[in-house]
Amino acid sequence: MIMKVVVKVGSNLLVGSSGLRKSYIAELCREVARLKSQGHEISIITSGARAAGFTYLGKGKRTQDLHIKQALCAVGQVQLMKVYENAFDFYGIKIAQILLTRDTFSNRKRYLNLRNTLIGLSEFDVVPIVNENDTVATEEITLGDNDTLAAMFSIAWDADFLVLFTTVDGVIDENGKLVERFDESVKLKDMGKSSWGTGGIRSKIESALMASRCGVKATICSGNDVSNLTRFVKGEPVGTVFEPQGRLKAKKAWIAFLSEPAGKIYVNKGAEEALKSGNSLLPVGVTGVEGTFDVGDVVEIVNEEGELVGRGIVNYSSSDLEKIAGHKSSDLKKILGYEGNKVVVHIDNMWVA
């Protein structure tokens, strides 16, 4: 069976004291070529652009100044892609560069365009090499780290597997033992962060959980042995495994994990129970509105204690919803002056937590 596999490789594996570890990238590409020869589709989520730019320019020092970091990424991304291209050329494999920001996923139109692009690349049998577009990403639109990017990309691509490579064997519990199957009751040992990377083990766990909740089987495992990639796809126990929890439909997965909520709708206990039973949200169950949003925006639905109940695409603007909150659907025309939608958020456009 042909599988879609996403492998994420961080700076701590790709970058050494003298710059990009070209020999390591060659090993990784060899392993990807092996999987492709078996018919599988592979995408690589790569870090390393900033470090590659730093080494290539051969001057300066590490800095937190945003414009310097973005300039280093702009220079380094070219060097990074050259190394991948040269490594894959040996196997006759062509690659594509994809640079993304959070807005690519949260904006529904751009998200669908990304999915269509990936379909096209699949038809050309091209390996996507994916990174965050750090040269334009600001604090408002940054993904924060490539672990999050890997999870979001896995969901957008409808991947079967997500492999998060790290420098350790997997998730380590407070007793120093490897956690082979993850559950949220595990007490963790603090593993810290790498010198170049932005994500620690907790970031990887959150990303693996996000993917698994959308039906992607994930692992956090050692990237020092690139054969772990093939072994995991073959079904061997590798690292810390996050079992898939049922695949959400593409639209609901987007609503749940990729969209950016524009506001909140507060609901009463009766509405909360109705939503959890698979019903749509009606005006009578709404107790309050927070934020400014329009028809078609994604909103969070929260209960009276402020706990998340779900997310959904709303059929009313925040101003109109404030007017009809708590009222029966039969009262809408009198309140609004027009025949409003009887449903605030339809169950087909809703993810329930």
From Swiss-Prot:
Keywords attached to this entry: Amino-acid biosynthesis, ATP-binding, Cytoplasm, Kinase, Nucleotide-binding, Proline biosynthesis, Transferase
Coiled coil: none
Domain PUA: 262-339
EC primary class: transferase
GO cellular component, one term: cytosol
Record: residues binding substrate: S47, D134, N146
Pfam family, one: AA_kinase
Domain of life: Bacteria
UniProt-annotated location(s): Cytoplasm
Pathway assigned to this chain's UniProt record: Amino-acid biosynthesis; L-proline biosynthesis; L-glutamate 5-semialdehyde from L-glutamate: step 1/2
Reactions the enzyme catalyzes: L-glutamate + ATP = L-glutamyl 5-phosphate + ADP
EC number: 2.7.2.11
One example of a Gene Ontology biological process annotation: proline biosynthetic process
Gene Ontology molecular-function annotations: ATP binding; glutamate 5-kinase activity; RNA binding
Record's keyword annotation contains Ribosomal protein: no
Annotated residues for binding of ATP: K8, T198, G199, G200, I201, R202, S203, K204
Function summary: Catalyzes the transfer of a phosphate group to glutamate to form L-glutamate 5-phosphate.
Family under the similarity heading: Belongs to the glutamate 5-kinase family.
NCBIfam families: proB
Protein name: Glutamate 5-kinase
Organism: Thermotoga maritima (strain ATCC 43589 / DSM 3109 / JCM 10099 / NBRC 100826 / MSB8)
